[in-house]
């Protein structure tokens, strides 16, 4: 089953991934940023490539909604609890829900003051807040 780490971009998702990855997966004494790979971004192509030709998704990105749940079902075949990062909301698009109770064990919603998000995004994008 999947536990989702979900947030608006620049809200602390990477920070929480670092904490959870260290707690659950660190086998050495020293932190290494590669451990963040233990909580991958769900939208990575490796989860969708067995289901659809990826070039089809590049020409029509919203087509991915047709494969959200099939990809999650494949992930859950292992029977293990897995964490995934996403910026997707638990919503439907053209009657296709992002996830289902059969695929999801829980959510961790990360919330940050929107004013801080704007500042963080501005620094990240190297633009002035005034713009």
What is the predicted function of each stretch?
Residues 1-131:
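PAPS-dependent sulfotransferase catalytic domain
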């Amino acid at each position: 089953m999947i536990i989702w780490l979900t947030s608006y971009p620049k809200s602390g998702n990477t920070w929480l991934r670092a904490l959870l990855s260290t707690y659950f997966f660190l086998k050495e004494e020293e932190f290494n940023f590669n451990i963040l790979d233990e909580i991958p971004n769900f939208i990575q192509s490796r989860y969708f490539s067995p289901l659809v030709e990826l070039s089809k998704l590049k020409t029509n990105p919203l087509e991915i909604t047709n494969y959200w749940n099939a990809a999650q079902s494949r992930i859950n075949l292992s029977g293990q609890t897995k964490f995934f990062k996403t910026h997707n909301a638990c919503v439907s698009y053209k009657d296709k829900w992002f996830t289902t109770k059969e695929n999801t064990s829980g959510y961790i919603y990360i919330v940050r003051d929107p004013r801080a998000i704007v500042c963080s995004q501005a620094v990240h994008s190297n633009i002035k807040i005034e713009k």
